[in-house]
């Protein structure tokens, strides 16, 4: 008998590879203080309510890195483009992605974008929910798939509840989080030992 992880998989096969222990890969979350390839911010209807804030962000970044604003409709995207034009910046100073969402808290529900050593990227999309939601925030939960499709990136789903605002990476293998990450995932029927194993 071959170990489970040795079974071949092809497009015509219903067999899936299952590994007992996850194998390390060479990707890592980029540290926030390192040079970024792009910046993604939630705008939604706030682009209309607080235009000066978004204009100031675009000016401060000054085309040093691509800036993307996530909006929920074409109307919001057009308002954003008009804002950028009205403050004298070129159209590419801030581009707008139309991706439906339920809230502005994009740092919490956006996927983690990881970089391989050879500069390829992929997205890791965790579960996302608040204390009282699943239905109320369904668009937020699926935002990662829409973003991956828009940018043409691979996306991997993981069965953990992770909020991006609850993580920070040093970009070199150290990822810090709070005890909240463990407690919400224990509610999802993971044991403490399973969670510690996943994070080590």
Model-based region annotation:
Residues 2-200:
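The feature marks the mature, well-folded catalytic cores of soluble enzymes
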């Amino acid at each position: 008998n071959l170990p489970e992880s040795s079974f071949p998989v092809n497009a015509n096969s219903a067999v899936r590879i299952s590994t007992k222990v996850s194998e390390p890969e060479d990707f890592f979350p980029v540290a926030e203080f390192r040079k970024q390839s792009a910046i993604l911010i939630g705008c939604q209807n706030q682009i209309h309510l607080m235009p000066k804030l978004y204009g100031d962000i675009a000016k401060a970044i000054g085309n040093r890195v691509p800036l993307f604003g996530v909006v929920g409709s074409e109307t919001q995207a057009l308002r954003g483009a008009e804002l950028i034009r009205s403050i004298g910046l070129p159209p590419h100073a801030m581009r707008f992605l139309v991706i439906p969402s339920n809230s502005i808290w994009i740092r919490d529900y956006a996927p983690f974008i990881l970089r391989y050593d050879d500069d390829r990227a992929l997205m890791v999309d965790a579960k996302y929910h608040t204390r009282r939601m699943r239905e109320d925030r369904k668009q937020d939960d699926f935002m990662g798939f829409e973003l991956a499709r828009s940018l043409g990136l691979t996306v991997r789903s993981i069965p953990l509840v992770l909020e991006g605002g609850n993580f920070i990476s040093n970009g070199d293998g150290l990822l810090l989080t709070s005890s909240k990450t463990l407690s919400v995932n224990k509610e999802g029927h993971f044991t403490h030992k399973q969670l510690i194993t996943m994070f080590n």
